[in-house]
Amino acid sequence: MEPAAGGPGPLIVNNKQPQPPPPPPPATAQPPPGAPRAGAGLLPGGKAREFNRNQRKDSEGYSESPDLEFEYADTDKWAAELSELYSYTEGPEFLMNRKCFEEDFRIHVTDKKWTELDTNQHRTHAMRLLDGLEVTAREKRLKVARAILYVAQGTFGECSSEAEVQSWMRYNIFLLLEVGTFNALVELLNMEIDNSAACSSAVRKPAISLADSTDLRVLLNIMYLIVETVHQECEGDKAEWRTMRQTFRAELGSPLYNSEPFAIMLFGMVTKFCSGHAPHFPMKKVLLLLWKTVLCTLGGFEELQSMKAEKRSILGLPPLPEDSIKVIRNMRAASPPASASDLIEQQQKRGRREHKALIKQDNLDAFNERDPYKADDSREEEEENDDDNSLEGETFPLERDEVMPPPLQHPQTDRLTCPKGLPWAPKVREKDIEMFLESSRSKFIGYTLGSDTNTVVGLPRPIHESIKTLKQHKYTSIAEVQAQMEEEYLRSPLSGGEEEVEQVPAETLYQGLLPSLPQYMIALLKILLAAAPTSKAKTDSINILADVLPEEMPTTVLQSMKLGVDVNRHKEVIVKAISAVLLLLLKHFKLNHVYQFEYMAQHLVFANCIPLILKFFNQNIMSYITAKNSISVLDYPHCVVHELPELTAESLEAGDSNQFCWRNLFSCINLLRILNKLTKWKHSRTMMLVVFKSAPILKRALKVKQAMMQLYVLKLLKVQTKYLGRQWRKSNMKTMSAIYQKVRHRLNDDWAYGNDLDARPWDFQAEECALRANIERFNARRYDRAHSNPDFLPVDNCLQSVLGQRVDLPEDFQMNYDLWLEREVFSKPISWEELLQ
């Protein structure tokens, strides 16, 4: 559905916000009025203009793309995560919630405010509100739910600052959790999901708006606030709050809701929405709640790292060579220097120029700090070619000057310090050592020994040293051990014994997802496609704007601008939630069991996740990351504490003062990490990256000067360099240098050359089918008890016990028993002689 349908006002829903003008140069660089420009008198008019243009281009290139001060974490700041729950269209509902609470509160308490009551009075009133949720009248129930939402929002009408609202919010939410609000809300949510009248009404409606999902939105808002607030740990938390947090996390991940974890109920809402049976579901809130539920029950990335270290010690594996989270946090965005071959190539292209003015040291500094990935805007289209256009448009010192001045002595700064070594310890797989020994034996001795990695008889001394070095850096992953154990279980099902499956939250969640996991993945990717900024509005695509569009479309340009910002923000939040959910599930399933991860990953690949993510990045990614789709004065809790100023076009366009949008950069990094997870060690999927021409798309993403994002882009480029041809590698030496500098080295990995054994013809179907067979065997062995191999089931040989077993016959069979007896027994002749023989 077109967002602008039904309203006369033009709706602005693009991501291209007006950019602020570039900052003026420093005051010291400005000549007084009438004074000649530096160097202008030394060059002819045309050359002077070109020199100044090159200077300006260099300085602008540096000022436009500074290093982004972004710290990757599980979530954004608490206040930001709260504000993203509400769309700006929901603004008037804050006062409705307050009104519903105060009307009910004044009946029972006449002379005091909520903030003036003691804990017992708070608990009494909270339980009274909870009882009100059990009334049958929908309108009364909605009023009580709004009153509870107001309490969860921090009773902001009695607070004077945002900090006070947040403080009361934490207190109120732990109070609501203590009296059992969450379980009552789950029952109500279940009832709303099964509300066939609301579903059929929404299906018949031509245009769905905010009003169609009021009940669901109120319930989901309260539940999200509870999950998000309880999950956030604060230093001043009471001891009982910490205990409640642990209990809540355990309950949320346990199969207590319809014999399934709570996340499965939310996944069911996603699939029901995508199937078209419930188009009124507020999908942004469902996805945000799903993300925070998965995060709360399974744990974040730092918790995952500690779980990984613990699991390695249980399996008897050596500890991890480094903490990847800390290494990435200490990395800086890549600005590799131009190599000699690049400079020579540029000189050959441009030819020797005439004598030029001497270059100041500050220009050299600007050159040193230039972003090597920044290409001219006019060359955006040329990046589809194999040339490294990041080099074009840069004016190198050796070209501009024949007489270089002696460098000035600058004090040592952080940017001039060079790293002492590569950030990552190299790794070697057992398979790599086997391949190296196989090739060495066939070369020097003329025979092979299979998977024997210890016998080195007859091999020269340098080969011995090489093997020693390889074994020093040998890394055995948890996934390899799990795959070997699975092979053992399948090879010897009787002697292997019964597998002990620890019921951790990830295992419980996987068991709940298993029956419908393909549908869940397809539904999430459908919504991701609809929310991507590159997707065009189609009549057959799903409408994800049901919980942002008002009942009456805007009539003024200002209202249209506000709604346009709201719609773009809404889509960005959806992308953020889906990318985070997928990444968390992939990482936790991989730790729990590699075949759980492979099952989910394969269904993502089958649902076209790889081209979808590449399509997402096939846009101006810098514009997406710096988009200002937010109106800070309308963000919660600012909007409920301060008086709202009159909105103008300028205030709408201004956005916030940050140099980037946290949620968009977070989403981009998550999607790159998902792409890495799907393609790592998968030859056929790596070839998909090559076939879909991902290299120029990924190279454009390197313009974002953020170390973590660059690292995952470089990883994706590294795995496909051997297939891109010699000319691409030759033309992209800066990118190759950055890969060498930033990405972990695998000894014996000829990633920079095309002569690797893996650079072979690929058969996508054969590789995926072999993997699928392993996954199906794993799922059948561990989860499909009904279809176990009958040869391995215990046999009851006792006649007494077999005859004594109670068989439950269906009721209709019992009623027509005589008919069955006549047709199946008496009417068929029995050859007793044959039977007795």
Swiss-Prot record:
Sorted UniProt keywords: Acetylation, Cytoplasm, Phosphoprotein
One GO cellular component this record assigns the protein to is:
cytosol
The answer to keyword Acetylation applying to this record is yes
Q: Which parts of the sequence carry N-acetylmethionine?
A: M1
Modified residue annotations for Phosphoserine: S59, S335, S339, S788
Note down the stretches annotated as region Disordered: 1-66, 333-423
SMART domains in the record, alphabetically?
Answer: DUF3402, N1221
Per UniProt, subunit arrangement is: Part of the core of STRIPAK complexes composed of PP2A catalytic and scaffolding subunits, the striatins (PP2A regulatory subunits), the striatin-associated proteins MOB4, STRIP1 and STRIP2, PDCD10 and members of the STE20 kinases, such as STK24 and STK26. The STRIPAK complex can be extended by adapter proteins such as SLMAP:SIKE1, CTTNBP2 or CTTNBP2NL. Interacts with CDC42BPB. Interacts with CTTNBP2NL.
Annotated protein name in UniProt: Striatin-interacting protein 1
Protein's organism: Macaca fascicularis (Crab-eating macaque)
